[in-house]
Amino acid sequence: MKRREAREKALQALFQIELNEMSLDQAIKNIMEDEQDDYMEKLVEGVMANKAEIDAIIEPNLDNWRMDRLSKVDLSLLRLSVYEIKYLDDVPNRVSLNESIEIAKIYSDEKSSKFINGVLANIAPEDK
């Protein structure tokens, strides 16, 4: 599975966890069915293990927004992206930013992709 697809599947699992208060294992199983992808699982597990710290990074960068007002898709995507940016050294920040924007265009809308870009641009230094 390519990393883009793994990110999309991770977003779907995180969305299910957020929306339905589903367990991590059940969400991964629902999304992956009989497939397995280590990177996808690493993303979901990493976000959930570091959720409080990730939210503490996101919140001050929301500019007149509150976490509870964000759509579940946008919140899940921001968490996923911040995890990649702050916790994974093998993914350049610009790649994570671009992937997040493109995924937002698919699962959210143009306005959300611009919002996500703005939030992540404040969080991620370009040079990593």
Swiss-Prot record:
What are the GO BP annotations of this UniProt entry?
DNA-templated transcription termination; transcription antitermination
Name the UniProt key words of this record, in alphabetical order: RNA-binding, Transcription, Transcription antitermination, Transcription regulation
Q: Which InterPro entries match?
A: NusB-like_sf, NusB_fam, NusB_RsmB_TIM44
Tell me if Transcription regulation is a UniProt keyword of this record: yes
- The protein's superkingdom reads Bacteria
GO: which molecular function terms?
RNA binding
Query: Short name of one Pfam family for this protein?
Result: NusB
Cellular component annotations (GO), alphabetically ordered = cytosol
Tell me its family. Answer: Belongs to the NusB family.
Protein task = Involved in transcription antitermination. Required for transcription of ribosomal RNA (rRNA) genes. Binds specifically to the boxA antiterminator sequence of the ribosomal RNA (rrn) operons.
Q: What is this protein called?
A: Transcription antitermination protein NusB
**Whose protein is this, by species?**
Listeria monocytogenes serovar 1/2a (strain ATCC BAA-679 / EGD-e)
Classification from the root reads: Bacteria, Bacillati, Bacillota, Bacilli, Bacillales
* Gene from which this protein is expressed: nusB
